[in-house]
């Protein structure tokens, strides 16, 4: 549970969202929620990188299809920062299985009804440890930036 501290988390806008033109809509939701994008790029994930990212699923039956899916098209990877960012982003993303995602969440609003739950629009780190590990997989330190936003002023002034 977050104690209202500033955190960073990794978000991946997955192939099903990229090919449907949802990148801007998804980024906009995070920014409107007061989260700050401190790193972002479009990349084509290699098979090797995908296998590192999803290493904890290596022995699961869906591992191969997960790697094939995430390497199918370019994706957008982002480092998102904010108070309790990991928890907030996970709530905004919605249930991992799109069939269970509530309307108003990213997956609830944008995931298509397909038999494969891996086509779920976004990836969001599930813990502080995962976020730190995943951010290091995709970003060098000099690719993550700090800059002021209006929210910083509100928190500093105690409004």
UniProtKB/Swiss-Prot annotation:
Molecular functions per Gene Ontology = ATP binding; metal ion binding; nucleoside diphosphate kinase activity
What GO biological process terms does the UniProt entry carry, in alphabetical order?
Answer: CTP biosynthetic process; GTP biosynthetic process; UTP biosynthetic process
Active site per the UniProt annotation: 123
Q: Which residues form the signal peptide?
A: none
Among Pfam families, the record links this protein to: NDK
- Keyword check for Lyase, yes or no: no
The UniProt entry, under CDD domains, shows:
NDPk_I
Instruction: Name the residues that bind ATP.
Output: 14, 62, 90, 96, 107
Spell out the subcellular localization from the entry.
Cytoplasm
* Required cofactor(s): Mg(2+)
Report the record's disulfide bonds.
none
Q: Which UniProt keywords apply?
A: ATP-binding, Cytoplasm, Kinase, Magnesium, Metal-binding, Nucleotide metabolism, Nucleotide-binding, Phosphoprotein, Transferase
Q: What is its EC number?
A: 2.7.4.6
Q: Which reaction does it catalyse?
A: a 2'-deoxyribonucleoside 5'-diphosphate + ATP = a 2'-deoxyribonucleoside 5'-triphosphate + ADP; a ribonucleoside 5'-diphosphate + ATP = a ribonucleoside 5'-triphosphate + ADP
EC class, as a word, reads transferase
HAMAP family (UniProt xref): NDP_kinase
Q: What does this protein do?
A: Major role in the synthesis of nucleoside triphosphates other than ATP. The ATP gamma phosphate is transferred to the NDP beta phosphate via a ping-pong mechanism, using a phosphorylated active-site intermediate.
Q: What is this protein called?
A: Nucleoside diphosphate kinase
Q: Which organism is it from?
A: Pyrococcus abyssi (strain GE5 / Orsay)
